[in-house]
Regions:
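Generic N-terminal initiation segments characterized by hydrophobic and/or small/turn-forming residues
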Residues: 63, 94-95, 114, 126, ...
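Short, glycine/alanine-rich amphipathic alpha-helical segment
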Residues: 41-68, 102-119
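Amphipathic alpha-helical interface elements
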Residues: 1-52, 71-85, 89-91, 120-149
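Acidic interhelical loop/turn segments
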Residues: 88-108
Length: 153
């Protein structure tokens, strides 16, 4: 169960990151020959760029909601760092994670991480759908309706 939870969480995070990059590229109409240059930016900078572009191009209430979602997405990234760089004890107490803070060098054990990661993966998926709805709302769709945002985990 632990390995499944880790994979699901990281997979959902990867898709979320891809979506953020795609919609930023689309919003600023970046020429395709420059797409790879955007891929090299770190996740936090990507979040800042998405937020700043939308601050200047969307209605205040939409921007405020997106800002809250981006804040939550940054929390997912903090968790991702722990998941990826921590030490796992997959068969102990529902998946135990040992993380050592780079800032304080203090270690912290967290038990029952498999269930928690499953919950966070589900929440991340829902937040990604909501952000996609915001991003798609601002696109131009000539002579047709905007596409519906649907999906499953």
């Amino acid at each position: 169960m632990t390995y499944h939870a880790i994979g699901r969480f990281i997979g959902n995070f990867s898709y979320l990151e891809y979506q953020l990059r795609f919609f930023l590229i689309d919003k600023i109409k970046l020429d395709s020959k420059f797409h790879n240059a955007l891929i090299t930016h770190d996740f936090s900078l990507l979040c800042t760029a998405v937020q700043e572009v939308h601050r200047q191009t969307t209605e205040p209430e939409v921007y405020d909601r997106l800002k809250k979602l981006i804040s939550r997405v940054r929390e997912f990234n903090d968790l991702r760092v722990k998941v990826v760089h921590g030490t796992w004890f997959p068969y102990q107490e529902g998946g135990t994670l040992l993380h050592v803070s780079r800032h304080s060098l203090q270690d912290h054990y967290t038990e029952e991480m498999a269930e928690y990661l499953e919950q966070q993966a589900e929440l991340m998926f829902d937040i990604n759908l909501e952000m996609m709805t915001i991003f798609l709302r601002g696109r131009d769709y000539p002579d047709e309706e905007e596409p519906a945002v649907t999906g499953t985990t």
